[in-house]
C-alpha cells in the first residue's frame, strides 16, 4: 500500500557539499582540512574536517556551484579541475539529523592558494599520509578522503591530472617529477 502524503509533510535531509582539496607542497601530496567550530549544537567540535557546508538554495544553482563557492571561500581561487566524487548519506553521519553530502575533489597548485587570514588557525594543509593527531576526521570524512585518494591515484595512470597541481608555466621535468 502506498502512502499519499503532501510533499510538505516529508522530512528533508540536511544537504551538504564537501570538497577534498589536494595540492603538492614539499614534494608531498597535501589535503586542506578545516577545524570544526565550537559552540552550542555544533557536532564534532574542534575535530578536523573537509571544507564544505550546507547547500544554499538562494545562492547555489547546482551542487557543482555550491562546491565552487565552498572552494573559493576557503582557498580564494577557482579550481581548473573539480570532479564530483560521490554521495554519502545516512541517519548516523550527522547528529543533527539525516544527512546527505555530495563530495567533490579539486586539484590546485600550492602557489595559487591564498588561505584567508581569518581561516589561518582553522584551515591548514596536512600531508595525506600523516593526518593530524587527535580524534578521527569529523563525520564520514575519512572515508570520503580515502575515496578521493583512490580516485586520484587511479586517474594519474591514464590522465594528465598532475598538471593541475603545477603552477603555469611549468617545465617537462617538473611534470615528470609530479608523476
Predicted regions and their residues:
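Short connector loops at helix/strand junctions that flank enzyme active sites
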Residues: 14, 77-79, 97-101, 118-120
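Acidic pyrophosphate-coordinating catalytic loop
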Residues: 10, 89-99
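The catalytic Nudix box helix
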Residues: 52-84, 104, 175
